[in-house]
Amino acid sequence: EAVAKESSFSDKKKTWKFKAQNVRDFGFSTSRKFIIDAMAVDLPTNKPLAISIYPKEANPLWGDLSTKAVAHTLKTYSHFTFDYPYPKAVSVSAEDQGMEYPMICWNYGRPDEKGFVSDRIKYGMLGVIIHEVGHNFFPMIVNSDERQWSWMDEGLNTFLEFLAESTFDPNFPSTRGPAKNIVPYMKGNQKYLEPIMSNSENIYNFGANAYGKPSTGLNILRETIMRREL
């Protein structure tokens, strides 16, 4: 149906009205090229829809994996924190970005022109979907200030992303979470290291300090200091 409508055109006007509760921002995406895929996610207190929206150029990668990744993220984050309260979570295919808003996010990752999907593209797409959908929890739902307290946004989210990646695929090549991955940053030039409480505009290496260091510390707390049962 989406492919058939791709070359169509209409000069008729149609008005869509959207309403959302308990959100602090919004995003919107539309195209006659979009394919829509969805599945319900059973949570103890809610049954949201995991939705993927993408053009045919994103297949077979998106049709096979995107909605599954969205649903898995909602289940995993809800298990470790609190039940996802919104009615839906939407993953939109974008050519080269990852960005989040309440209930919707844009994620990169597509096959090449011949339809080939490398492991780098596949796991990159899965990682960004899990991460951006996860931002619904931190900072959107808890409503923290990600510019002032980056570790409460990117750090907490990256820690939960690592848990979701590990349970989605035991061989997932996670870049942040395992302690060994933060070693090059921590033993590097010490004058460029910042406390995790630093304002996001005052961090020299934003990725390692706001994403990597907090998520690794939380993982060490879970695996070594307190152990998983606590």
What are these regions (language model features)?
Residues 45-48, 105, 130-137, 184-198:
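Active-site-adjacent bridging/hinge elements
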Residues 63-70, 119-127, 149-154, 207-214, ...:
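Solvent-exposed, acidic/flexible segments
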Residues 57-64, 145-147, 201-208:
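Active-site rim elements
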Residues 83-92, 145-148, 171-174, 229:
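Surface-exposed patches in mature extracellular/periplasmic domains of secreted proteins
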Residues 1-130, 159:
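Hydrophobic helix-coil surface modules that form long, contiguous segments used
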Residues 69-74, 129, 133, 137, ...:
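Alpha-helical packing segments of well-folded alpha/beta enzyme cores
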Residues 133-150, 163, 167-168:
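Catalytic Zn2+-binding segment of zinc metalloproteases
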Residues 154-216, 224:
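Acidic/His/Gly-enriched intrinsically disordered linker/tail segments
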